[in-house]
């Protein structure tokens, strides 16, 4: 394809970083999800399995295409539980969206194996785990297609932006058509009209050159950003391992964790709430520009039962699309709290804390001291 400037250079550099042949920059992570699912041909009469812990855009991208999202419970990695996933597969299941949440890779290998064995597509949502890996293999390379987000809160950002990556040329060309004018392009950048499968309705998700230039610089910075966060997190985490009363999130591969978030889980929701308030009193507090230390029940549209449009099955149009479509008549459409009991319990008993890339050792000491004081008071000897 003819060189388009900063955006295409970023696409080539990001693809090389992941070890994949194709990357397509788009205007947002949500746009990346919509583009990926559109390229896969998702539509009415199909079901897509999604985790109970994700971002609202995951289910929105499925619903907007006329398919039905099916919830799967999570495990102690805070990713999809492979055993529960198997129980959610029906004859209508078309694919799985596996989400690497809160900075660390989920247990993706058994999910990928299930997808292969059942003939399902696998989309990796890497929006919160850019730079993560499992035994050296980067997230985003285990499935058929993956998406990334470069929104303002991400470890690599252009304010807004996203990317679709794949090793499948046909899928890439369909994604190009979706994100652009509805047609793919040849190697010279000219629109292709002769292949009916590549003639779709375009969405206009193109990324602009300014953000492409920013992302090229950010990509070069990302390894040190991830290293700083990981070093801070695991210094804190090592200290917390010695404290009573908490359980740390299971990390599939600590060397591949981006270090962006630290999740701690307690015996009961009441204890979690009290510890959260006590940590805030010690100065580990939320701040206007972002997340510092909150109970996971405050984590908004990342929790399935907080997505009101999903719970109420809100329609795209007045005719009830997609819920009332005859193609979707036999699909289960239940999303109330209680559908995913493991997730419900973890959300109620856990605290999530962000780990900035700019923490000093004195900041890490303050966090460790606050946890030590609070945990020994509530869960151990107050000495």
Question: What is each residue range found by the language model?
Answer:
Residues 73, 352-360:
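Proline-centric
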Residues 129-135, 142-261:
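Active-site region of PLP-dependent enzymes
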Residues 269-275, 360-365:
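Short, conserved charged micro-motifs
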Residues 183-193, 235-240, 276-350, 379-383:
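Conserved PLP cofactor-binding pocket of PLP-dependent enzymes
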Residues 113-121, 163-181, 274-283:
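Basic phosphate/pyrophosphate-binding loop/patch that engages nucleotide-derived ligands
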Residues 2-47, 61-65, 71, 137:
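Phosphate-binding glycine-rich loop
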Residues 38-126, 133:
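PLP-dependent aminotransferase-like
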